[in-house]
UniProtKB/Swiss-Prot annotation:
This is Tegument protein UL51 homolog. InterPro entries: Herpes_UL51. Plays several roles during the time course of infection, including egress of virus particles from the perinuclear space and secondary envelopment of cytoplasmic capsids that bud into specific trans-Golgi network (TGN)-derived membranes. Oligomerizes. Interacts with ORF55; this interaction mediates ORF55 incorporation to virions. A lipid is attached at C10 (S-palmitoyl cysteine). Keywords: Host cytoplasm, Host Golgi apparatus, Lipoprotein, Palmitate, Phosphoprotein, Virion, Virion tegument. It comes from Equine herpesvirus 4 (strain 1942) (EHV-4). It comes from the Viruses. The lineage of its organism: Viruses, Duplodnaviria, Heunggongvirae, Peploviricota, Herviviricetes. GO terms for cellular component: host cell Golgi apparatus; viral tegument. It is found in: Virion tegument; Host cytoplasm; Host Golgi apparatus.
Amino acid sequence: MFKWLMSSLCGTKNPASLEEVYEPIMGGKNPATMLRLQSALAAVNALLPATLTIEDVISSADNTRRLVKAQTLARTYQACQHNIECLSRHRASSDNPNLNAVVATHMANAKRLSDTCLAALMHLYLSVGAVDATTDTMVDHAIRMTAENSVVMADVAVLEKTLGLEPQPSVMAHDLLALESSVYNSGNSVPVNDYPAEDVESTQSVHSPLLSKRPSNTEVVCSSIPVKSNLKSKPRRKPSLVAA
């Protein structure tokens, strides 16, 4: 009696009582239990691409545990949606800049938490295995549902990581590097005509690695450009004067 009184005052409970207890519902259908299951399915199915049935859930104890976790995630997701909707009504002003920063921080945290809950729901939904659907369909439906709820997905990678997907970029890394290098070379290459040739006896070769490759006709044009020099050429004598 004294031990129970002290545990009640201190707020501690027996570790054995903290274990999860699930009611057996396969043997008979208790109306109160079935009502709770239907309420949980209604909360979870609102966020899933295809609805689950009670038969899918009560087929095994693991599915029942998944439903309990999914119900908690669904309620958390709905709470985040409500908070995001309320925070989006805030209009930033210069009167209270500290409030603007707090609202922005709460908005980002709510979006990230909602995305995480949605990703976990998709993972639990796929683990049930009662619906014939592919992982790509799940991701597409999840993104579409989030877009329809006017929620910007702050971290789409959470879905990919949770579902075990690897992003497939449209452009490979080495292709992107080659494209950037070609753009850099074309932007930094300077034509030979732009170099000052006042005191230069010969022009720079067009095959220099510092310059981009040019067509053959351009090389011919560049080679025919006269080179200026500081040496003044002597005037030629007329043939008549030389003959005289």
